[in-house]
Amino acid sequence: MGAGETGSVYKVRRAVHPIRACVTVPGSKSVTNRALFMAAMACGHTVLEGALFSDDSRHFIGSLEALGYNVAVDEVDKRVEIEGLSGKIPNRTGTIDVGSAGTAARFLTAMLALSDGGYTINATPQMQARPMDSLFEALTELGAEFEYFGEKGHLPVKVRGRGCHGVPDKNCSPDNAQNTAFMDTGTGNAGDRPAVVHIDISRSTQFLSALMMAGVLIPEGLDIKITSEKTDGAYIRITSAMMKAFGCNVEYDGHDYHVGAGQRYNTGKYYIEPDISAACYFWAAAAVTGGSVTVRESRYGMMQGDMKFLDVLKKMGCTVNQTGEGIQVDAPDGGILKPVDVDMNDFSDQSMTLAAIAPFAQGTTRIHNVGHIRLQESDRIEAVLTNLRAMNIECGTFTEDGKEGIYICHGIPQPAHIKTFDDHRMAMAFAVTGLAADGIVIENPMCCRKTFENFFDVLEAVLSKN
């Protein structure tokens, strides 16, 4: 980390001049980890270009390696190569560690639950605290069995795949034939009824993404019945688009989902989009410092839901343009930001970014429908309010139609130590506040290793050029 680091804190340097920069951000975590799953389940050699290398993706890669997959990694060129085995998992037993990666935890649990092997899934205390019960219940409905080592409905667990149902444990030993997640390597029987599963996705759409991607492993197909009011979302659309790119289709009827029978993931070369979640911090930096920031290789039409944050910045008065290098955000003329009233349920990772810049808007900003973020890497609502209040910013929660939101009033942020709660997004979002306020210090800044390990180095480079 660069010049702002002192021990276990990072002292944010207030920008002396408007930030004007063109920055490169890493590949998308959401896209990288979905691509890793599909490549492992494909038949043959797949190359992933522009991959993210961070704690989350390394835990996903490490888990695949622990399961016996041949994975070649080139962190310099941001490339991962995987030999897929048509749904076969090389090792019939084993232990994986998903760290704090929600995508790895949810996606790999579904993969292993549809196998005929027995596996242990470990995680950090942070991930152990996050909900998994809805996914465990759905996979149990499909025939998997779970043994909990701690609290029921949470990691760590031992999973016994649906292919072991009614089969003695000795038949899931390493001495037997290679495990296969595809229960049949044929095309499936058109006369077979699809398997059926029910899932509540109100707390995380990763549960549905896991079932969609793993559903390809069921030869007769899978009908996914949604039991929650929420039935769709930006990350679900990412999953569906990526499955289509890898040769598999999912039908959505406006409420439920159907994964067709006899599908397989294709191999080839797949390019990982830049991480728009990471890009948003730098676009927000332009907004609060009166500057202009372009994020290289970003473009309109990208599938990541956080692209909607650009619409929020427009409502605040910023100008957004597509350039040859990438999307450029310019602060409003005169530097005055407008308050906004916005539902961020579909791109809630940016609710923290908006909360961090909202004090600079000339009025009260209201962020609707984000109650589910209490159950993520931290209680993100409480963490945001704690840090805003530490800066002497008036803020609080409200409920509308039974859904929780946050309001943030205009104010001048006072010097404060930002508690990250080991949450990468808290560290990066409030670093943006510090670009336009004095005395902002980020505690435990390296929690950003989860998704953007050199974030503060990039930030320092930007500041050094302005």
Region annotations inferred by a language model:
Residues M1-N466:
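Structural preference for solvent-exposed beta-strand-turn elements
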